[in-house]
Structure formats: structure tokens, C-alpha cells
Design a protein with these regions (language model features):
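Generic hydrophobic, amphipathic alpha-helix propensity
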Residues: 1-6, 22, 47-51, 55, ...
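Helix-loop "lid/cap" segments that line or gate small-molecule binding pockets
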Residues: 80-86, 94-104, 178
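Residues in soluble alpha-helical coiled-coils and helical-bundle/repeat scaffolds
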Residues: 38-42, 46, 53, 86-90, ...
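Hydrophobic alpha-helical connector segments
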Residues: 46, 60-91, 142-149
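Amphipathic alpha-helical packing segments from all-alpha helical-bundle domains
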Residues: 56-57, 61, 87-96, 106-133, ...
Length: 190
């Protein structure tokens, strides 16, 4: 049902998504839907939270599996994963659709705010892992850096490809480097 809902959102948008169509696509009854979710909004928040939790868990595992104290190697591995994630625009589109839905629907906005707060905490934990592991001295607290990383990712997703800009993964790693007080790499000459 989650996969069918996700596909519906990406194809039609949140406003056009119907529980009946989701259930039909998933091969379930509407009763099955309501035995798992109180409303369409609950489903929407669940979809986004579960994806972000899975992704942050994967990123934290990547950090934990990196050997040694070479932050550059760790950032390179994280950038590789972020580049792969950027190739899956449906997740960024989903997040943007939900943000727009929250802006238009006050009842959903509160649930969405709670869901985003959980996501920010998860990103903050990832940043805290890096700070501890490499004894970094960040410019902002870990959760605030996580909020900034998430906002930057979403903003870049909305922008799409920008002529002359570096890739999303390079931009995120550059932002993290700046926030972590790491040496900033010289910008490439055009």
C-alpha cells in the first residue's frame, strides 16, 4: 500500500491522490487501509518518515563502517550515496509535495511538522556521529546543521539542474565542510 501511495503522489500529486485508487493499485480493500492508517494524512507522514529513517540509518551505517580517522574518505563515501539518492528524484518530489500540502492544509501541517521534527533529529544524529567520530568543532549544533542540510537538499531538488552549479552531493558536502570547520576546498575555475 505504501508503494502504491508513493507512486500515486509522484504521478498525480497529493491533492489528486485517492485512497480508493491506492487500495485498488495495491490490491487491498479500503478497510485494509483504515486498519493501518487513520487518514490519508497519516499515510503521507508515514511514507516520508519511513523513507528518511531508512536513508539516515543507511548513512549512519556508512559512517560506522568507514575505517580509520580519514574524514575525507568518509565524506567521499557519503557523497557517493548522496549522488545515488539524487538520481532518485521521486523522494525529493514526495517531500516537496508534502511540504506544499502542509502549507495549504492546516490540519495536515501539524502532523507534517511532527514528522519533519523527527527527520531533523535523525539528520542531527548523523551529524553528531561525524562530529564525535572525527572530533569536529561545528559552527552550529548538530541538529541545526542537519536542518540546514535537509533544507539545502530540498532547495536544490526544487531548482533542478542549475547551469554552472556543482552537483547536489558536492554542494551538501561543501555545506557540511563549512559547518564543521573543515578546510574549504578551492572552487574549481570555470
Amino acid at each position: 500500500m505504501i508503494a502504491a501511495a508513493h507512486a500515486s503522489i509522484v504521478e498525480e500529486g497529493v491533492a489528486a491522490m485517492s485512497i480508493r485508487n491506492i487500495c485498488s493499485a495495491a490490491g487491498h480493500s479500503q478497510g485494509a487501509f483504515y486498519s493501518n492508517f487513520a487518514s490519508k494524512d497519516d499515510l503521507l507522514v508515514d511514507i516520508l518518515q519511513s523513507h528518511i529513517q531508512d536513508e539516515v540509518t543507511l548513512l549512519r551505517d556508512i559512517v560506522a563502517q568507514c575505517v580509520g580517522d580519514d574524514i575525507e574518505a568518509t565524506l567521499e563515501v557519503l557523497a557517493d550515496r548522496l549522488a545515488k539518492l539524487a538520481e532518485e528524484p521521486q523522494w525529493s518530489l514526495l517531500s516537496i509535495e508534502l511540504q506544499l500540502h502542509a502549507r495549504r492544509n492546516p490540519a495536515f501541517a501539524e502532523r507534517h511538522r511532527e514528522g519533519k521534527a523527527a527527520c531533523y533529529r535523525m539528520f542531527g544524529e548523523l551529524v553528531a556521529d561525524l562530529v564525535r567520530r572525527f572530533s569536529l568543532r561545528p559552527a552550529l549544533p548538530a541538529e541545526q546543521t542537519g536542518i540546514g542540510l535537509y533544507a539545502l537538499w530540498m532547495g536544490l531538488a526544487v531548482q533542478g539542474d542549475v547551469e554552472g552549479a556543482i552537483s547536489r552531493d558536492e554542494m551538501l558536502v561543501g555545506f557540511f565542510r563549512a559547518m564543521a570547520g573543515l578546510d574549504v576546498l578551492e572552487p574549481a575555475k570555470p
